[in-house]
């Protein structure tokens, strides 16, 4: 999956790997209150019984803190943290090397687990359930099965596409956790915390302006904060207020709701070329010259959350909110069109 470079893309970039702004404990972590409360209970219970924590599956859009929470869990459990991703584990031997090097209670984090090789996934089942590796050594008549006992570990996995996980794999996670987009108030706290860490003078209105445009995503909030700091240090005295934040983000083509040029192209294309829809995802992908999965996983979730598009049986359709945001007049029969489309289901 690839997408044109975007300031507000929720995927990791080089600068995002900087641990400076990441919270180190559950107490420092802002947002996802129910998730934090539940994880605290599960962690304390596992420590009290001196057992490995049950396997955890984080589900949600990119940039919401899945990796950060996995690191925090290992830290709070007092165990080692090992990290990899689904596409990196190409063969059974790669997984075996990871698992046999784990110590008792260690946390193994697998990002993008929905992209795991099916042959590797088969090896993972007994490892998760029985803490054993079943490997075939040799070939042909000389082949034999070997069982290797593993230390009891905790697998923490992350996915943006739960539907791509097989049922057997999904069912082996005892603690499924769904992460949701953050509120503006939560993002404002995250921005303030980041500014303190960066020793950056930040006014209340400046923090709010950055939070409003962060698309409900902490990773984007941190990235916008850094870019606004650049503008403030060059074009001003280093202090960030609403005017500086607005000027910087407007120049970076991030509008008041966090939409960028690609989002507006998406909405404008449906409005101007297809009368507001419905239009199929393949047509949209061709029109934007972007891959379908990138549109479904990265562009559309936030637009749906903001009430700008609807997914109907016949394709994507703009809502009245989208027409207003574009400054265009919606079709007079928009409401009836939407009713008719959903009656076709």
UniProtKB/Swiss-Prot annotation:
GO MF annotations in UniProt: ATP binding; ATP hydrolysis activity; four-way junction DNA binding; four-way junction helicase activity
Alphabetical list of SUPFAM superfamilies matching this protein: P-loop containing nucleoside triphosphate hydrolases, Winged helix' DNA-binding domain
Annotated region (Head domain (RuvB-H)), positions in chain: 256-345
A cellular component term, taken from the record's GO annotations: cytoplasm
Pfam families named in the record: AAA_lid_4, RuvB_C, RuvB_N
Binding annotation for Mg(2+): 67
UniProt region (Large ATPase domain (RuvB-L)), positions on chain: 1-182
Main location: cytoplasm
Gene3D superfamilies documented for this protein: 1.10.8.60, P-loop containing nucleotide triphosphate hydrolases, Winged helix-like DNA-binding domain superfamily/Winged helix DNA-binding domain
Binding site for ATP: 21-22, 63, 66-68, 129-131, 172, 182, 219
Main enzyme class: hydrolase
Reaction(s) the record says it catalyses: ATP + H2O = ADP + phosphate + H(+)
Record keywords, A-Z: ATP-binding, Cytoplasm, DNA damage, DNA recombination, DNA repair, DNA-binding, Hydrolase, Nucleotide-binding
InterPro entries: AAA+_ATPase, AAA_lid_4, DNA_helicase_Holl-junc_RuvB, P-loop_NTPase, RuvB-like_N, RuvB_C, WH-like_DNA-bd_sf, WH_DNA-bd_sf
Cellular localisation: Cytoplasm
Keyword DNA-binding appears in the UniProt entry: yes
EC number: 3.6.4.-
One example of a Gene Ontology biological process annotation: DNA repair
UniProt function note: The RuvA-RuvB-RuvC complex processes Holliday junction (HJ) DNA during genetic recombination and DNA repair, while the RuvA-RuvB complex plays an important role in the rescue of blocked DNA replication forks via replication fork reversal (RFR). RuvA specifically binds to HJ cruciform DNA, conferring on it an open structure. The RuvB hexamer acts as an ATP-dependent pump, pulling dsDNA into and through the RuvAB complex. RuvB forms 2 homohexamers on either side of HJ DNA bound by 1 or 2 RuvA tetramers; 4 subunits per hexamer contact DNA at a time.
Domain commentary: Has 3 domains, the large (RuvB-L) and small ATPase (RuvB-S) domains and the C-terminal head (RuvB-H) domain. The head domain binds DNA, while the ATPase domains jointly bind ATP, ADP or are empty depending on the state of the subunit in the translocation cycle. During a single DNA translocation step the structure of each domain remains the same, but their relative positions change.
Protein name per Swiss-Prot or TrEMBL: Holliday junction branch migration complex subunit RuvB
Organism per entry: Mesorhizobium japonicum (strain LMG 29417 / CECT 9101 / MAFF 303099) (Mesorhizobium loti (strain MAFF 303099))
Phylogenetic classification of the source organism: Bacteria, Pseudomonadati, Pseudomonadota, Alphaproteobacteria, Hyphomicrobiales
Gene designation: ruvB
């Amino acid at each position: 999956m690839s997408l044109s470079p975007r300031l507000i893309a929720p995927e990791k970039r080089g600068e995002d790997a900087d641990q400076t702004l990441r919270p180190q404990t559950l107490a420092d972590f802002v947002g996802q209150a129910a998730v934090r409360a539940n994880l605290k209970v599960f962690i304390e219970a596992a420590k009290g019984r001196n057992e490995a924590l049950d396997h955890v599956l984080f589900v949600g859009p990119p940039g919401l803190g899945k990796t950060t929470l996995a690191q925090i869990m290992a830290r709070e459990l007092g165990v080692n943290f090992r990290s990899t991703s689904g596409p990196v584990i190409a063969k059974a031997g790669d997984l075996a090397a990871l698992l046999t090097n784990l110590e008792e209670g260690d946390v193994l984090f697998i990002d993008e687990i929905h992209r795991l090789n099916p042959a590797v996934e088969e090896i993972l089942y007994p490892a998760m359930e029985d803490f054993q590796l079943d490997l075939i050594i040799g070939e042909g008549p000389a082949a034999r099965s070997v069982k290797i006992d593993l230390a009891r570990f905790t697998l923490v996995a992350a996915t943006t596409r739960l539907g791509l996980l097989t049922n057997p794999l999904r069912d082996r996670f005892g603690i499924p956790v769904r992460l949701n987009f953050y509120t503006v108030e939560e993002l404002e706290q995250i921005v303030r915390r980041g500014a303190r860490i960066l020793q950056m003078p930040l006014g209340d209105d400046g923090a709010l302006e950055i939070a409003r445009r962060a698309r409900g995503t902490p990773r984007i909030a941190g990235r916008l904060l850094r870019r606004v700091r650049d503008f403030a240090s060059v074009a001003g005295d280093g202090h960030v207020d609403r005017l500086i934040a607005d000027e910087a983000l407007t120049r970076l083509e991030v509008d008041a709701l966090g939409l960028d040029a690609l989002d507006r192209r998406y909405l404008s294309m449906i409005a101007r070329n297809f009368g507001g829809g419905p239009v199929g995802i393949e047509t949209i992908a061709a029109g934007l010259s972007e891959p379908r999965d990138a549109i479904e996983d990265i562009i559309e979730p936030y637009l749906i959350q903001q009430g700008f598009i609807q997914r109907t049986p016949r394709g994507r359709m703009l809502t009245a909110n989208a027409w207003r945001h574009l400054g265009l007049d919606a079709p007079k029969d928009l409401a009836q069109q939407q009713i008719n489309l959903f009656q076709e289901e």
